Each structure stands twice: as C-alpha cells, then as structure tokens.
Design a protein with these regions (language model features):
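Conserved short S/T/G-enriched processing/targeting/catalytic segments and their helical context
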Residues: 22-77, 101, 341, 358-361, ...
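Acidic/Gly/His-enriched mid-domain segments of enzyme catalytic cores or analogous surface patches
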Residues: 40-74, 88, 102, 106-174
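Extended C-terminal regions of large enzymes
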Residues: 6-8, 13, 23-24, 63, ...
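Alpha-helical support elements that line or immediately flank enzyme active sites
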Residues: 76-98, 182, 186, 196, ...
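Glycine-rich phosphate/pyrophosphate-binding loops
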Residues: 83-117, 195, 200-215, 368, ...
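N-terminal basic/disordered segments at the start of proteins
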Residues: 1-36, 91-92
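Short coil/turn connectors at secondary-structure junctions
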Residues: 1, 44-47, 94-96, 105-107, ...
Length: 622
C-alpha cells in the first residue's frame, strides 16, 4: 500500500510502500508502532489514519469506502468509522492511506493529488450562500479551490462545529459532479468521534483528494475472473448475486420499499427501541399501538414520497447499482439517524425528525449519539433528577410511554430537542457544556455526585443505555433491541456483533457475536460496504487470493482486542440498569429458558461468561 505520512509539526510529508492486508490492518500496525495506546486521545502524536482497501478502481462494486482509524474520544481505544464512496475519488491521488501526526499551527485543509501535497491554512466557514454548517464549508472549498476539484476530479471530507466544540464530531463528504453537489451522494463517518479526533488532535478541518489513478491490482479489473468466482460459489453471475443479496437496500418487491428506513420499520415492528429504550419494559400490545402510529405518521410520508411519487434513489458516489440512498425532498434518509431523532426521543412526525437530523448533520455530529443524549435528558427531567431550567429549557418534554399523544407531543418534543442540540454546540448551559466535553458516561458520574441527594432508586447513568470500556470509555449502541449491542465485545457502536433480536446462553451468544465480528472486521478492512456483506463474505478468501495473490489473515479482531487491553479500554461490566435490562427483557420477550435474570448476580454471571467465552475463542489469555 502507498502510504502518505504527513508531519504537521514539521510541515513535511513522505510516501512509503508498506505491505498490508487492508486499511485497518495497516492502521493498527501504525498505532502500535507509535504506542498510541498509552497516550491521551487528543495527543498530536497519536496518528489519525484515513485510507481505502485493495479492491478499488476495477470492476468490483461497493469497495470504495474509506475508513478512519483513530483513538476514539468515546471508547478511549481504537475505533473504525467508514464513509461511503469517498475512495472512488480519493484513489485517484495514487495514495492508499493517509497518516497524520502533529498539530497544525493554524486550522488547515490538506490537499492531495498525484503532483503534490499542500497544507492550506483555512478558517472554518459555517454559513455560505444558502448553505449551513458542513454543507457551507464544503461549498466554500468547492468554489474557492474550483481548479483543484476540476483538474483532479477531487472530493472533500470535512469536519464541522461538532468536532470543534464537542467529543462527538464526525466526518462529512458530499460527492461532486459537474461543479455541483450530487444529490443524495452525501455520507458521514458517524460513530466514535472521528471528526473530533482529527480537529482537536491535529487542527485539521478537512482533506481534499483526487487524480486519475485507478486499480491497484490488475485482476480487480478482470470481470471474467470475478464473474467466474461467483458462478463457482453461487451458481449464478456476479450481477445476479448482487441483485439478490442487496434487495433490502435497493428495492424489495415484497415490501414495495427499500433502504434501511423503508425496510426496518416493516421488519422490526414492536421490537423497535422507543423512548430511549423505555419501550422494552412495556407489553407487546402497547408497543404495537406505538408502532401503528409510527407507521402512519413517520413511515408513510417517506414511503409515499420516495417510492410512489419521486423514486429518488442514489448512490454514495461508489461504483454501485444498489442506490441505497433514498432521498426525501433533497435529504438522504436512513433508519438510524431518523429513528434517533424521531421515535427514540418521542417524536413521531417525520418532517420534524427531518429538521432535527438536518440540523445535527449541519453541525457535523453523530446523530445516533445526539439521540441518546436527548432521550437521556428527557428521561432525567421526567424522573425529576433534573429540572428543565437546569438544561436550558423552559418547558417539560413528554416522555411518558403510557400517556403519549403522537401528534401534539411529538411537535413539543421536537422543539425542545432542537434547543438541546443548539445548547450542545453553544455550551450556554453548565450541564450541556459538561456533556459536550465529557460525553455521557463521565458526565453521568459527575452528575451522580453533584445531585446525590436527588437519587433514590436509579442513578443518572441508569436512564441511558451504553457499553463501558476501561475507566472512562463507552459507546451507545446502534438502535436495535439486541443483547449483542451491549455484550462485552471489544468494538461496539457498529455491527461487529450478533445484533439479531435473539437470546442465548452467553457462551453460545459469544460464539455468534465472535463470528460476526471476524467477518465484519475483514469486510471493513478491505474497504467494502457492509450492505454487500451477503455478496462478498462467502467468497472473500477466494476473491482476495485471486486478486492480490495473498491469503486472508483472520487474526485482525484478535489484534484489535490486544490493543484495547494495552490501552486499558477493554469491556467492563455494565454500569447502566437499562443496559442490563436490554438483555433480560429480550430473554423475557422470547420466553427463553436459557437464563434466569432474578438478581444482580445473574446479570454479572451472564456478562462474565460471555466475556470469558469470547476471549477463549480469540485465544486471549485471561
């Protein structure tokens, strides 16, 4: 792999050829060489790494994701966050991996082409023409450096105010065609705080890259070879396999919908997590009533506009025929961001969620994490651990699952949520400022001490779901009612686990989660979109061997776990009652006899047996 090392302290760069299986494998190697496990998350000597996989530039679809490898402000260990389609333009520079160390004297943007690497001092622009936030900054860069974008067919990846002011900033990128943003082809590397790591650790606001280099391996451009591999495995050609395995994300004739938003509401029904996961405590009949309101007020407006009227489907900018980006009146719609600021916070009006998602997107923050912060604060106010005025509000949210008016209360909750979002950026309130800086886990412990006289049965941390790592690390799970989302896995906040609505004894659940973690880590290591996992996982060994001439090394997840152990950020026992109850209520929901959760020790035993089983499968010494 061709690796660009940029030293911001010295204003120098060098290019090295380093043999590596994929981007995460290389990133892990470099982080170990720099011993980043023992350094602060924002230490400038901790590398920020951004790169693509080996399959780019040829005839393979869905292989142009770029992956950020960084020490996460949330988990306090390495995290990996990918962004769709960016590699299709970035590969043109001839660089496979960008490694950034040091701290720029002024806020800057890095420009990379086959001819040069430039570091330009640029102040952030949060309002430009008719654009706001990351959209404004992206537009500003496109116009100011128009010649660079045109000459090198370049694309920009930028951070926003969420990276400047909070722990929860992400990376944003909009594909460009004919000097304009390509509708729907926007994406974020959302989870884990990649943007905050890039800006606070290195004072970098963005990276712009392009050129005309294509495939790295000739066989990646050999369609006959690719097609033969799929014919041998599936008995059908490559394109036919793609159409079959990705129909959920494009269009499913059975449901007459598609994409994660269109499909998940139909699939999960009363198993959807609502009201910050409070829904898990209520009977199926009540959850079903909520679900019916969500379908009517939240899902149908999207379905009618995107699948009946306009059929506005796009790609992220990758070479891809799935067109998973479903666009509602110019805004890309996916399940998790819209659910996070929709039903998860007690907002069942689709247009209201759209406004909130767009606001958080403009600020360049991870929408899922923001949804957790809002639902947590709503619950704390509902349970009188905080007063509205203490978080900058002048009215109470409606967060009672049994007594909720889907229309009127949704508008009210949406209005209040907007104030909280603004407060997280402006830090015009002591508690919101604390959360913006420290995140949920550390903040909850500070609030436990500050308001200890208010605590009766439940502490501040009991009203929010998160998984803990080491002393301060944590991550809020993706929005599925699944024990695997909070089980003691080394990487969470993504799909490196068994996230099905199921339950099993810990050693069995650990095995299925381990299997998913191995496969998901390899898919991401190679820069492949996980929407293609059903396409590539069955042929991954063969495909990698044929194209690169090398065998696929499956020890990556073990090496990641070993790094986390060195960083003192391995999984630790649940601190949140609601996280514990996410596991036990799924057991109850399925009428499972595999485990009894009657006392605290039962939860501890399930967690410990899971962790011991996982470590055994990984070959780690306890």
């Amino acid at each position: 792999m061709k690796v660009l090392f940029i030293n911001l302290d010295k204003g120098e760069y060098k290019i090295s050829d380093i043999d590596s299986q994929g981007i995460i494998s290389l990133g892990l190697k470099i982080h170990n060489e720099y011993e980043s496990w023992k350094k602060d998350i924002y230490d400038p000597s901790v590398p920020f790494i951004f790169g693509l996989g080996p399959f780019v530039g040829g005839k393979l679809f869905g292989v142009h994701r770029m992956v950020a490898i960084f020490k996460s402000p949330l988990t306090r260990t390495l995290h990996f966050s990918s962004i769709g389609g960016v590699g299709y333009k970035f590969m043109g520079s001839g660089i496979d991996v960008i490694v950034i160390i040091g701290y720029s004297k002024e806020p800057s943007v890095i420009f990379i082409s086959p001819d040069n690497v430039k570091i330009e001092s640029i102040n952030y622009v949060n309002s430009y023409k008719n654009y706001k936030g990351v959209y404004a900054f992206s537009r500003y860069l496109l116009e100011k450096y128009n010649d660079f974008f045109l000459n090198y067919n370049a694309r920009a990846v930028v951070v926003g105010e969420g990276s400047v002011y909070t722990y929860n900033g992400n990376l944003f990128s909009f594909d460009i065609f004919n000097r304009e943003f390509r509708m729907g082809s926007e994406d974020f590397s959302g989870r884990g705080g990649a943007g905050s790591s890039l800006f606070k650790g290195h004072n970098i606001l963005g990276i712009v890259s392009g050129g005309n280099y294509k495939y790295r391996y000739e066989k990646a451009n050999d369609f006959q070879l690719i097609n033969k591999i799929f014919l041998e495995k599936f008995g059908k050609g490559y394109i036919d396999v793609i159409n079959e395995k990705t129909k959920k994300y494009k269009y499913d004739p059975e449901t007459k919908s598609g994409g994660t938003f269109g499909e998940n509401y139909i699939l999960y029904k009363e198993l959807l997590p609502l009201f910050g996961y409070k829904s898990i405590y209520y009977p199926k009949e009540l959850r079903r009533k909520h679900y019916e309101n969500i379908i009517e007020l939240f899902w149908k407006p999207f379905q009618e506009e995107v699948f009946i009227k306009s059929k506005s489907w796009f790609t992220c900018g990758d070479l891809c025929n799935v067109a998973c980006k479903k666009v509602y009146k110019g805004k890309k719609v996916d399940y998790e961001p819209f659910h996070s600021l929709g039903p998860f916070i007690g907002n069942y009006i689709f247009e209201e969620a759209l406004k909130l998602v767009d606001l958080v997107d403009q600020y360049g923050m991870d929408v899922i994490e923001v949804g957790y912060v809002i639902s947590w604060l709503f619950d704390l106010v509902e349970n009188k651990l905080l007063g509205p005025g203490e978080i900058g509000l002048n009215e109470y949210p409606i967060f009672n699952f049994e007594n909720f008016d889907p229309k009127n209360d949704s508008y009210k909750n949406s209005k209040i949520a907007e104030k909280i979002i603004e407060g997280l950026i402006k830090k015009n309130n002591e508690i919101l400022s604390l959360i913006s800086e420290k995140g949920i886990r550390v903040s909850s412990k500070i609030l436990n001490e500050k308001y200890k006289e208010r605590i009766k049965d439940n502490k501040f941390n009991d009203y929010v779901v998160y998984a803990s790592f080491g002393n301060e690390g944590y991550i809020t799970p993706n929005l599925y009612w699944s024990p695997g989302m909070v089980a003691p896995m080394y990487i969470l906040g993504k799909y490196w686990t068994d996230y099905s609505n199921s339950f099993a004894r810990p050693e069995i659940f650990a095995r299925s989660s381990y299997g998913r973690a191995i496969n998901e880590s390899l898919i991401e290591d190679l820069g492949i979109c996980r929407f293609y996992r059903g396409v590539y996982e069955p042929v991954l060994d063969k495909l990698y061997k044929e194209i690169t001439g090398k065998d696929l090394d499956k020890n990556l997840y073990k090496e990641i776990a070993e790094y986390s152990i060195k960083a003192n950020a391995e999984p630790v026992l649940w601190e949140s009652k609601r996280a514990m109850d996410l596991v036990s209520t799924m057991c109850r929901e399925l009428n499972s006899n595999d485990w009894k959760f009657e006392k605290y020790e039962d939860y501890v035993e399930w967690w410990k047996e899971f962790k011991e089983s996982l470590d055994k499968y990984l070959g780690l010494k306890n």
